[in-house]
UniProtKB/Swiss-Prot annotation:
Its membrane topology: Multi-pass membrane protein
Subcellular location: Mitochondrion inner membrane
Transmembrane segments: 9-29, 73-93, 137-157, 253-273, 290-310, 341-362
InterPro entries membership: Mitochondrial_sb/sol_carrier, Mt_carrier_dom_sf, SLC25A32-like
Protein name stated in the entry: Uncharacterized mitochondrial carrier C227.03c
SUPFAM superfamilies, per the entry: Mitochondrial carrier
Solcar repeat start-end pairs: 3-98, 131-276, 284-369
MF-aspect GO terms: NAD transmembrane transporter activity
Organism the protein comes from: Schizosaccharomyces pombe (strain 972 / ATCC 24843)
Cellular component aspect of the GO annotation: endoplasmic reticulum; mitochondrial inner membrane
Amino acid sequence: MVDDSLKDAIAGGAAGLASSLVVAPLDVVKTRKQAQKAFYSTGGGKNTMVLGGTLSSMRTIFHNEGIAGLYRGVGPMMLGYLPSWSIYFVVYEKCKVLFGVNKKYTSLHEIDSSKVGIKASLDSSDKQFYRYWGGQIFSAVIAGAASVTLTNPIWVVKTRLVTQSHPRASSFVDKIAAATTVQFRNLQTDAPSVKWRMPRFWLKRRTNVKSSPSQHPVNPPTGPACSPAYNNTFDAFRKIYKYEGLAAFYRGLFPSLFGTLHVGIQFPLYEYFKSFLDDFFGKKSNFHIVLAATLSKIAASTVTYPHEVLRTRLQSLDAPTHNSATLLIRDIWRSEGWRKYYSGMATNFIRTIPASSVTFLSFEIVRKWLN
């Protein structure tokens, strides 16, 4: 007899794996739009790649980097989604029991629609109604916190791989030894590029760097802006640890923990919508799962999307001046406006809605099959 926790782990891992493969190209576009200023080039903007809409961005990346560019970071993405969802669903189900959620509600596929749908909403005095919603929300938040804390290093590596642009020429050494002006890419169509003059103390450090086309600089300065180009997932892990230390793997953890509010909204709403639809139509259907996942994802993303922008910028390759989430929030507000907190949101919806549907549908199907 397979333990329920193991079933949840297997089903969650399968769900994460399926969703990562389906939406990898859209995730690359979304991450690059969010990272915006993390993209840089040297040599007077020769390598500047301006991204517009979702489809045009995919064409641009494909033209400049090939099919590999659209699937850049898919290795750590798969490596991240599999344990993330495995950990999440295991902790989620355990927490629901811990918080006293009725046995009828202890798993996604066993919800009693007569207690959760319209009838539960109308009977707001019912203690079971409050226990259900409170248990669901706290369980979702705790499971999210456990998942992001344990897997944050993987997402840092994934973000670094995705946000480093790979024109077919130019190496890391060339970029380190090149001109003294770094040109950040502005990913808005028709918007001019923004140039940033590097500080004097940094220029002095750059002039002392010795390099050759075949090796990395001797005693390079540390920090995400100076990290070498990464050849693959394991190379990224090694170089980040070597040049930046263990703490770099937890860059952006605070915004990620704030993002647990996302699942705190999404999961209770998903279970509510799914049960409501089953109750309304008098039968269970995979279509109800997809629709419930879509509606809950839209609601949760609209409320919590800014944290994803903050997390991506903190984790990105070239964000040396933003080591604090508070400072980054202030800087974005002052220099770019509040709209930048929702940069790439349209692309995010195109990516996350199918991903959410695939994740929940895969989980429900695999979990039912394991039973």
